[in-house]
Structures are given as structure tokens and as C-alpha cells.
């Protein structure tokens, strides 16, 4: 584990906990930090079904102001023709590799199950696993007539 990168992640998450609106931490770092503690994950993935560019810009502005890190937009696109995604690169003094932050439109959950850890909104472990299965299989979960979650696609 890169201790400087972890320190930067935790600083961004601390700032995020004070400013988060509709976005919540998801992905590998959410699993690693708050649930499994299984491996070091290097990026921060923030998901929201609302995906507001204004909110993203305010969060990034807050990250810059409070952390002092240089943050630049790397790319902005629609993944798979569905989910909007914005990738940012955070330059950390003394590190060769940057911290990567992405903001992703959640096209799987309209109302994700969000937990809070020290104020940080984090997707539930069930939601995280369904996202991983969806990403791996290329299918999407839907609820059938009697409330079971099934995959289609």
C-alpha cells in the first residue's frame, strides 16, 4: 500500500463527507476501505443516479480549495452509450502516480442503498456487488413481478 496515496484518498474523502450531495463512494475503494479490507485500491469512484455536472464541479472545487492539490479533468464521456462519466487526475506532491477520481452516472440503481462511515456516504455492500456483477457480465439487474432481482441483457 502506498501510504501517501492512502493519505490523499482519506483527505479527499474527508472533504467529500462535508460536501456530498447525491454522490456516494462506490467501487473497489469502497469495498476495500469499508467492507472487505482485502486489497489496496488506488482510485475513488463516486456514483449518483442524478449525475449533476454542477454538483461535480462544486465537489472538485471544494477538493482543490481544501486540499491544495492540483486537479484536472482528464475525460468526459458516455460509457457504453448509457452512463455519463467524468475522470479527474489529482497530482499529489511526492508521488509518481496520480490519484484518479471518477464521477459516474448510476444507471443500475435509481435509489441506491447508502451507508455512512465517519460521514462518508458509501454504497451498501449488496449494491457494490450487484455493480461488479453487472460490469463483469454486461447484464443489468431488474426486479421481477414477485420482487426477486434477476439479470437481463
Question: How should these model regions be labeled?
Answer:
Residues 1-26, 30-153:
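Compositionally biased terminal segments of proteins
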Amino acid at each position: 500500500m502506498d501510504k501517501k496515496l492512502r493519505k490523499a484518498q482519506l483527505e479527499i474523502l474527508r472533504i467529500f463527507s462535508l460536501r456530498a450531495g447525491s454522490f456516494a463512494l462506490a467501487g473497489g475503494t469502497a469495498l476495500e476501505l469499508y467492507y472487505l479490507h482485502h486489497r489496496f485500491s488506488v482510485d475513488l469512484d463516486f456514483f449518483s443516479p442524478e449525475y449533476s455536472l454542477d454538483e461535480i464541479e462544486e465537489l472538485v472545487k471544494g477538493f482543490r480549495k481544501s486540499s491544495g492539490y492540483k486537479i484536472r479533468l482528464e475525460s468526459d464521456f458516455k460509457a457504453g452509450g448509457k452512463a455519463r462519466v467524468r475522470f479527474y487526475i489529482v497530482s499529489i506532491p511526492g508521488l509518481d502516480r496520480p490519484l484518479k477520481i471518477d464521477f459516474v452516472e448510476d444507471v443500475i440503481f435509481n435509489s441506491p442503498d447508502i451507508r455512512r462511515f465517519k460521514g462518508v456516504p458509501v454504497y451498501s455492500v449488496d449494491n457494490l456487488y450487484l455493480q461488479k456483477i453487472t460490469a463483469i457480465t454486461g447484464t443489468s439487474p431488474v426486479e421481477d413481478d414477485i420482487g426477486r432481482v434477476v439479470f437481463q441483457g
